[in-house]
């Protein structure tokens, strides 16, 4: 098996902005998603898809990612984890994803990216499960960003025309792309 690492770094000034609807979040502690405390960096990160900036070495990895459906699905076969940092201007996310066959076909912004290998970030500034942002980036560095009023399962509406102001992304693939040989 080829050990292909797919890495992306996402930056957005807008993600630090908050919004409030007064809605309640999950009612029970077991309903809460995993959390991660992003550290502050004094020096801006270079957005190149690599984790060789000194600030990244001090940031801890998240726990290994699981399926969005939780225990109803088997453990993922390949490791995915992330790191997050912020400074006075940006919020940074880096992902390390092991995948033997990285594929990317979509090149148009706001395409339905999850049809390719992708990494998705959901940002809910006030933690109420409403008025949140979604960003997806595929192996070709194609971006899909939108704002949702609430989750789809709750009748939420979305705005695909909305773009993350100041967004910068980069992807570094250590291995092959679109080659299963």
How would you label these PLM feature ranges?
Residues 8-17:
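Bacterial N-terminal signal peptides
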Residues 19-181:
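Structural preference for beta-rich elements and adjacent junctions enriched in aromatics
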């Amino acid at each position: 098996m080829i050990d292909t690492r797919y890495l992306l770094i996402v930056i957005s000034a807008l993600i630090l902005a908050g919004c409030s609807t007064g809605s309640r979040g999950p009612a029970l502690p077991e309903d809460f998603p995993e959390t991660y405390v992003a550290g502050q960096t004094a020096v801006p990160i270079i957005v190149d898809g690599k984790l060789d900036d000194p600030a990244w070495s001090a940031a801890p990895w998240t726990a290994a990612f699981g399926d969005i459906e939780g225990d109803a699905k088997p453990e993922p076969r390949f490791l995915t984890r992330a790191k997050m940092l912020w400074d006075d201007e940006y919020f940074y996310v880096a992902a390390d994803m092991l995948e033997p066959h990285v594929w990317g076909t979509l090149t148009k912004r706001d395409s339905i990216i999850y049809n390719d290998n992708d990494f998705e970030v959901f940002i809910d500034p006030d933690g109420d499960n409403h008025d949140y942002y979604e960003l997806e980036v595929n192996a070709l560095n194609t971006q899909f960003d939108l704002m949702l009023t609430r989750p789809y399962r709750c009748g939420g509406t979305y705005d695909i025309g909305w773009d993350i102001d100041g967004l910068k992304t980069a992807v570094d693939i250590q291995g092959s792309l679109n080659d299963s040989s």
